[in-house]
From Swiss-Prot:
One example GO MF annotation: metal ion binding
Annotated source species: Listeria innocua serovar 6a (strain ATCC BAA-680 / CLIP 11262)
InterPro entries on file: Ferrochelatase, Ferrochelatase_AS, Ferrochelatase_C, Ferrochelatase_N
Keyword list, A-Z: Cytoplasm, Heme biosynthesis, Iron, Lyase, Metal-binding, Porphyrin biosynthesis
Location of this chain's protein in the cell: Cytoplasm
Annotated gene: cpfC
Catalytic activity reported: Fe-coproporphyrin III + 2 H(+) = coproporphyrin III + Fe(2+)
Top-level taxonomic group: Bacteria
Signal peptide range in chain numbering: none
Family membership noted in the UniProt record: Belongs to the ferrochelatase family.
Pathway stated in the Swiss-Prot or TrEMBL entry: Porphyrin-containing compound metabolism; protoheme biosynthesis
HAMAP family (UniProt xref): Ferrochelatase (MF_00323)
Name of the featured protein: Coproporphyrin III ferrochelatase
Length: 309
């Protein structure tokens, strides 16, 4: 009989419909209800990208696509995917409970974010472990990060090189690659959190494989908390680089994200483009991984390597 293993795929979550926006935002704010102004601002950003974020459907396609890729590649183990979200149902705890009800005793978990941070991935893993410990009978093996997987680096390099082909050859010298991820509060540095170094390493590994001659590291989508966050912000970085180097082309590559959602469709495609338009440079962004076969193969390799090591 084939062994059955739970595949817990964790992600941030997004509102499914307009009525979800307030409770979703309240959850992000640890139970503090947002002001009407804050809700209107978030609703306005969703409106600017054409409605609600496509993230929910993409996360589903990634989770079930990964399940299929794992099961198609071997017949020793049957993986069963469960989606657990941080800020909306099905919550991480709901997914662990569903595994428990299905009689799953062994599971492997992956967060749909390649870099580890005590602030993000560790919080997901802790919630999953706490839920499993409370129910008893489920052992979850957690994957902490997967940014160094060679197929992940190659996937981004290929996408960047394809994007660079749209730029006239003689202007490639005036092109810069902006590699970015979600900013986090600066206080994580006090605890030697590996997150900033992991992003730097990702940028270095990708830059080694691309035809673009310049690159810079930026942060984006910081929270409105009043405390300092990791910088430079990608918009400030764009202005600074243009002012100093007069680059004609900016290729934005938000490698900390794996799907087209608000932070990419608004913070990059709208806000960064506003800045490139302002300075007279061209905006470019390679397609996000979403549930593309190359990305499902990245995830399959990550999970299978972790499971079999």
């Amino acid at each position: 009989m084939t062994k059955k293993v739970g595949l817990l795929v964790m992600a941030y979550g997004t509102p499914y419909k307009d009525e979800d926006i307030e409770r979703y935002y309240t959850d992000i704010r640890h139970g503090h209800k947002p002001s009407e102004e804050m809700i209107a601002d978030l609703r306005g950003r969703y409106h600017a990208i054409g409605g609600l974020s496509p993230l929910a459907k993409i996360t589903e396609a990634q989770a079930y696509g990964l399940e299929k890729a794992l099961n198609d590649a071997q017949d020793e183990v049957e993986f069963k995917a469960y989606i657990g979200l941080k800020h909306i149902e099905p919550f991480i705890e709901d997914a662990v409970e569903a595994m428990h009800k299905d009689g799953i005793e062994e599971a492997i978990s992956i967060v749909l974010a390649p870099h580890y941070s005590s602030f993000s991935v560790e919080a997901y893993n802790k919630r999953a472990k706490d839920a499993a410990d409370k129910l008893g009978g489920i052992h979850i093996q957690a994957i902490n990060d997967w940014y160094k997987q060679p197929k992940f680096i190659q996937m981004w390099a290929d996408r960047i090189n394809e994007t660079a082909k749209q730029i006239p050859a003689e202007e490639l010298i005036d092109t810069v690659l902006i590699v970015s991820a979600h900013s986090l509060p600066e206080k994580i540095k006090q605890h030697n959190d590996p997150y900033p170094d992991q992003l730097q390493e990702t940028a270095d590994l990708i830059f080694d494989k691309v035809a673009v001659p310049h690159y810079a590291l930026g942060w984006q989508s910081e929270g409105k908390t009043g405390e300092p966050w990791l910088g430079p912000d990608v918009q400030d970085l764009t202005r600074e680089l243009y002012g100093r180097e007069k680059y004609k082309h900016f290729i934005y590559t938000p490698v900390g994200f794996v799907a087209e959602h608000l932070e990419v469709l608004y913070d990059n495609d709208y806000e960064c483009k506003v800045v490139t338009d302002e300075v007279g440079a061209a905006y470019h962004r390679p397609p996000m991984p979403n549930a593309d076969p190359e990305f499902l193969e990245v995830l399959r390799t990550v999970v299978w390597d972790a499971y079999t090591k």
